[in-house]
Amino acid sequence: VIRSFADKATEKVFCGDILTRKEANRLGGLRLEKAQERLAILNRASEKDLLTLRALHYHKLHGSDRYSIDADGRNSKWRITFAWADEGLTDVEFVEIQDTHK
């Protein structure tokens, strides 16, 4: 169960609320409907569930206590990152992955 969000924009997408222009610009390129579906999956899934849902590409972030799944598809530059706590998921947020190979 999602217990907290790292920012208001991610929380608004989860709740289906309207984003401000600034929030929408920051999340440009993110397919919001698909991202909302992924947040709903996170909200009801256990870690075991995430491990078996291969399409999410669930993994631990190297050198961190945070985890990640694809936000809206494998070829997207967007991920949903979060931390596990005893009571559920915390600090859930959308993160745009930058290409460092340019």
Feature names for model-found ranges:
Residues 1-38:
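Arg/Lys-rich, positively charged N-terminal/basic patches that mediate binding to nucleic acids
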Residues 1, 54-57, 93:
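Glycine-rich, flexible loop/turn motifs
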Residues 44-70:
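A short, surface-exposed loop/turn module that caps and links secondary-structure elements
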Residues 62, 66-102:
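Enriched for short, Lys/Arg-rich terminal
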Residues 3, 32-35, 51-54, 62, ...:
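Generic structural signal for well-ordered secondary structure
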Residues 36-46:
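Short, amphipathic alpha-helical segments that act as regulatory/interfacial helices
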Residues 15, 47, 87:
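Residue-level marker of positions within ordered structural domains that often coincide
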